[in-house]
Amino acid sequence: MVSQTILIFIGRGGINKTTFFYYILPPCLRQYFINESTANYTDKDFMEAFSSKALICLDELESTFGKGLSALKSNVTKLVFSIRRPYDKYRSELLHRGALCGTSNSIQIITDEENRRYSPWFVDNIESPRETPIDYQHVYAQAVALGQEVTNRVKNQEEGWVYWLTTVDIDVMREHNGMFMVSN
């Protein structure tokens, strides 16, 4: 299972958007955070981060067009990255493990009307996690409980329940994302 949605915080600078994403990982896992403010979405290092990092922050995310947009959309949904590392004779198959998040000061960042991968939200302010520490024990206990619920529902094949976005969900998301579309 791969997270195919990018949670994006949009708001003015200095309100702890990136800081929040960094601190959402407890200190023992922060080595698995990467801030990619100048990411080249076709670069092998960027693709390798999907396997080696837990959270990839697309900081200062702006409008993405053309080849860059196609590469980003493809990378978000890939289950496996097949890359040849420098000096290796053969390709390595790297499982997609990382989730993406993003920040932007710009409101209009979406260029693709069909883009269901972006989940942008206006943020006025975020309490500094440096000054008000995150209660990791309770946050991650809730995450584990939700993960177990998803696993059980999938295993039990509960009728009418899915863990992916439905057509209705995608329509609602498109309507919401309309306010973040780049004007033509």
Label each PLM-derived region with a short phrase:
Residues 69-93:
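Conserved catalytic/switch belt of AAA+ P-loop NTPases
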Residues 52-54, 96-99, 113-119:
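Short glycine-/polar-rich loops that comprise or flank the Walker A/P-loop
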Residues 151-184:
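DNA transaction DNA-binding modules
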Residues 110-128:
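A short helix-turn-beta junction within AAA+ P-loop NTPase domains corresponding to the substrate/partner-engaging
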Residues 46-51, 85-103:
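AAA+/SF3 P-loop NTPase mechanochemical coupling elements
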Residues 1-52:
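P-loop NTPase catalytic core of nucleic-acid-dependent motor ATPases
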Residues 124-153:
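C-terminal, non-catalytic macromolecule-binding modules
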Residues 54-76, 108-115:
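Conserved AAA+/SF3 P-loop NTPase catalytic/coupling segment centered on the Walker-B
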